[in-house]
Design a protein with these regions (language model features):
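Short acidic-hydrophobic sequence patches enriched in Asp/Glu that either
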Residues: 114, 214, 218, 294
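Hydrophobic alpha-helical transmembrane segments and their immediately adjacent juxtamembrane loops
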Residues: 224-356
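Long amphipathic alpha-helical coiled-coil segments
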Residues: 201-216, 237-251
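Peripheral, non-transmembrane regulatory/ligand-interaction domains of membrane transport proteins
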Residues: 1-204, 210, 221, 225-235, ...
Length: 356
């Protein structure tokens, strides 16, 4: 019974066929090995875990059912650890680790190239060989280290999204932003419980079998990594909230600019419409006095052009014609003069008062 996409290696770096016979032979010789089961069906996993290894029924049940919170449970002589990692493709992978003092069994539904790469390094590794505690550490450390490149890539995406929003906000950017927020929420749901789990593990309240003081230092480093990852997740969530506010503010500002421009157009045409209506009245005085071309050009066209130019000058001075609504900078002669001595004092940092 061979299992595809899985591997079995012993602590000496040799790889073996994943089969029931091989596992039984290694168990009979008390050899230390690591068995990784990737994407196996429930019947195959049940046969290996229950019949071949003889694990506790509750341990088998928890190991076969995914979607659990990160946790550590002890069942007789086996300890179950549920750990989440992040792959290079930006998705979470749930790994169930069945740990004993002689062997380690890892189970996961989705492919995890990081664990395969770790197995390759172990096969090529020279002495010293990791013991059972450090083997579990290497597996968990590989999964946790996968978060950092994913978060670094997310940081770059947030920067690019923020720059794009400042240039031209679109509805598509909102979809990208909310996808990132959902991804961070999913990260938080698994990172924080893992952080608490390793805090308990390194405090001595729920130590692993065979844990030594030297190995505990390595597991404490995992706890430090999870604290850092949790802080990064919180920082990126706050940053995305700021990007969302930036998007909404930018859209609102652009809308205000459009409304302002339309208001300017309506304001310009308001006096023109008044003049047109006023001189369009059919009274005898206007009909008798505005009869020549110069009178028409002066009263009908010239007055409207003068009003339009006057309004544009007023709008220009108030800064209403600029896209950002800012007032044009003052001329150099109109700016207040600051001497070099005054500039030097302005540039100096404030000194703290002397303490009593």
């Amino acid at each position: 019974m061979a299992v595809m996409d899985s591997f079995l290696i012993t602590v000496d770096g040799s790889e073996h066929e994943v089969s029931t016979g091989t596992v039984r032979r290694l168990l009979d010789t008390s050899a230390r090995f690591w068995l990784d089961l990737a994407g196996v069906d429930k019947s195959t996993a049940d046969g290996l875990l229950r019949d071949t290894f003889g694990f506790h029924p509750l341990a088998v049940h928890d190991a076969e059912h995914f979607g659990q919170r990160p946790k550590i449970d002890a069942y007789d002589d086996v300890t179950l650890m549920v750990v989440y990692g992040a792959t290079g493709r930006g998705r979470l992978v749930e790994v169930h680790c069945l740990y004993t003092e002689n062997y380690l069994v890892t189970i996961h539904r989705d492919a995890c190239p990081e664990l395969t790469a770790l197995a390759t390094r172990l096969k090529q590794r020279a002495e010293p060989r990791p013991d059972h505690v450090m083997l579990l550490y290497l597996v968990v450390n590989t999964l946790i280290d996968g978060y950092f490149p994913v978060l670094a890539d997310l940081d770059d995406q947030i920067d690019e999204l923020e720059d794009a929003i400042l240039q031209r906000p679109t509805d598509q950017q909102l979809g990208q932003l909310f996808d990132m927020k959902r991804w961070l929420i999913a990260l938080r749901k698994v990172v924080d419980p893992q952080r608490d789990m390793f805090a308990t593990l390194t405090s001595g309240a729920d130590a692993l079998p065979g844990m030594t003081p030297d190995a505990e230092r390595y597991y404490r480093a995992l706890y430090d990594h999870l604290i850092r990852i949790s802080d990064l997740v919180d920082s990126y969530r706050d940053l995305l909230s700021g990007v969302l506010d930036t998007h909404l503010s930018t859209v609102s500002n652009r809308l205000n600019v459009v409304v302002k421009q339309l208001t300017i157009i309506a304001t310009i045409f308001l006096p023109l419409s008044f003049l047109t209506g006023f001189f369009g009245q059919n009274f005898s005085w206007m009909v008798n006095h505005i009869t020549s071309l110069p009178a028409f050009l002066g009263a009908g066209i010239g007055l409207q052009v003068a009003i339009t130019v006057a309004l544009l000058v007023v709008f220009r001075r108030r800064g209403w014609l600029s896209a950002d609504g800012t007032v044009p900078p003052a001329r150099p002669a109109d700016r207040p003069h600051v001497t070099r001595h005054e500039r030097w004092h302005i540039a100096q940092p404030l000194k703290e008062p002397a303490r009593p």
